[in-house]
């Protein structure tokens, strides 16, 4: 029986033999489609190839693409664990043709793989085609010998594939497997098609049109093929199973869950184990691809999946975090096919453990609240939306988690009520995914790249060069010239200006032609082009002209120093904190650097000092900074760190810095820092000058941020600090060496004086004032006092003294400070069952025009804006006591 790993390999090997390039799975966070939350099909990374906006050095491709469907249009979360074939994470096997072959080859490829390589009996297969697609039907009859009754024509959109409201589309043919009459269900298109007898295993899309926003369709530049076959589904078939969760891979994760919770994998907790197994995959792969749990966007979807799995672990009786203990089982199954899983294992485990630990603090209380709410409702009534919102807002229960919990009890949620309470938050979430604005003007950059090719970057070796102006874009439109006052983007055939990427900001400088000048204010990338953002300062600039280009040298030098220091900082952090540290973002600007990295807690002062010292040690060593060009695989084999979120081509730049015996990295195994990086760097580490860490802060959940200065900026910062120290020393009339002791003495002296002042205030307050004698009100002694200028923080002590004076009774203290009142009330312990200080102080506050007040039955405080009615406040309290 083939394993899922075997099936994946068989698929890819088949298409490799048939001239296809095996392309790595793209990340779950789409690189080229801002409208998608997660990659949800194999064709996502090839979308621009289908539309003709992107060309690659191959026209046939095959992939095993990791996908997530849990949020937005494609959302399988609610059904996961309860059905045989729903998943949040799945693998999509696919083969693709970009204007190479079409139906006449795609159909034979599919038939041969299924019937020969996978050895599926021919008589078990049937297909559907779009009702007008006579060509596909004819090919199926010719290639597979299928009779007409096993080639079913479907007139609905089930056989016309569209990625969304816009984009590539076309008719498709779906291949089904017939499990036989012992399983209920009818063929596709019949009234009983929802049964499990006929299961779709492969969808072949004949990509021939593009759908536009106005509803019209135009032919694609070239006819293409996009196919998709779920690995879990074909795996179940080839392993003789009717349930994806019974395949070898899923079964191993289910058994790991059962072992970790000491429960039966097939007992009453079967559904819980299935949810955990599925969600373990989606959460682990999302974390490996850089998504961290948060309260918005992708991070919120990740958190929802995590918490759903954690609730099911809780229902299995798990008292401690479980999910992180299952990661090794997942890595054993899938780490070979997806190395990023192995590389990120430590971070995945730490993130899962931290999130589960946090959620468990509120899970029990939230579930108790849910039970209490249900107990108050009539049998079968839905949970009010307000209660569901409270579970979300107070206990961190996403709505679908509450729905999942109620599902087991046959209950539902008043979703409309919940949505009303969540309106503001949902508006923010929608805004987060309304698109980045890149889509509408991307076509012009594709068009220019098609016409002119990519910009050649010369800036590794020079800061001055000449280039030819290929195009000028103003307001998203290709224009014939630019004049003073205009802000435009200029495209050149080559440039020394670095375009913003990898955390390094774009260069600035000057462009000169025979007829004009422009100030370059920024440079960014778009479809391989370097977009020079320019303000024309004099004359006229036109496409076709030659241009002299000069980068701002001082600014570039400062950026280089910061970028190189970032590499040293990354390695020093890994050595100080552990290999789980991975870059999650950076900013290398001329005036500062910022480095975001995966780590779950704040760095101590000692850890920061250790990291800073190590960075400066290597700066002082003044070692060479070397760059080599090699393949990504060779770079990783040498131990190079890849920059998070970057897409690498067939060749990469590998930057090495410093020497460290026994590091195991680099050509000699003794390189300190080794990273894949396309940025600009210093020639020698000594060129950085100095690195000063300003501090460490939280960037997001599980991500820390360090900010630092280098070179002249670091020196200026230290000089400023020294100047401040000198000013403080002069103020203290102490030498720098004596400053600490002097400050400590002043702090202690201040503390003593504050205590003395507080004591004097208490003595002055207790020494007299209006209503200073206790009254007897209905057998209760009541002592009220009006004082001047006593701060609220001193009043509890005075209340204690007043209670001591009366022995048994109630007391009230009103302090008048610039016309505003601070109030405190007290009740001796023997009377708190009859009187509450909270009620007394609220009555006094209301008499003074205030509201509220709070505390304990024996002591409470409040405030009010008008102290002039203090006597009325006393009378109000007397009324409460006598009432």
Curated annotation (Swiss-Prot):
Keywords: Aminoacyl-tRNA synthetase, ATP-binding, Cytoplasm, Ligase, Metal-binding, Nucleotide-binding, Protein biosynthesis, RNA-binding, tRNA-binding, Zinc. SMART domains: tRNA_SAD. The keyword RNA-binding applies. GO terms for cellular component: cytosol. Zn(2+) binds at residues 563, 567, 677, 681. GO terms for molecular function: alanine-tRNA ligase activity; aminoacyl-tRNA deacylase activity; ATP binding; tRNA binding; zinc ion binding. SUPFAM superfamilies: Class II aaRS and biotin synthetases, Putative anticodon-binding domain of alanyl-tRNA synthetase (AlaRS), ThrRS/AlaRS common domain, Translation proteins. It is found in: Cytoplasm. It catalyses: tRNA(Ala) + L-alanine + ATP = L-alanyl-tRNA(Ala) + AMP + diphosphate. One of its GO terms (biological process) is alanyl-tRNA aminoacylation. Binds 1 zinc ion per subunit. Its cofactor is Zn(2+). InterPro entries: aa-tRNA-synth_II/BPL/LPL, Ala-tRNA-lgiase_IIc, Ala-tRNA-ligase_IIc_anticod-bd, Ala-tRNA-synth_IIc_core, Ala-tRNA-synth_IIc_N, Ala-tRNA_ligase, Ala_tRNA_ligase_euk/bac, DHHA1_dom. Its EC number is 6.1.1.7. The keyword ATP-binding applies. It holds the Pfam family tRNA-synt_2c. NCBIfam families: alaS (TIGR00344). Catalyzes the attachment of alanine to tRNA(Ala) in a two-step reaction: alanine is first activated by ATP to form Ala-AMP and then transferred to the acceptor end of tRNA(Ala). Also edits incorrectly charged Ser-tRNA(Ala) and Gly-tRNA(Ala) via its editing domain. Belongs to the class-II aminoacyl-tRNA synthetase family. Consists of three domains; the N-terminal catalytic domain, the editing domain and the C-terminal C-Ala domain. The editing domain removes incorrectly charged amino acids, while the C-Ala domain, along with tRNA(Ala), serves as a bridge to cooperatively bring together the editing and aminoacylation centers thus stimulating deacylation of misacylated tRNAs. This is Alanine--tRNA ligase. It comes from Cereibacter sphaeroides (strain ATCC 17025 / ATH 2.4.3). The gene is alaS.
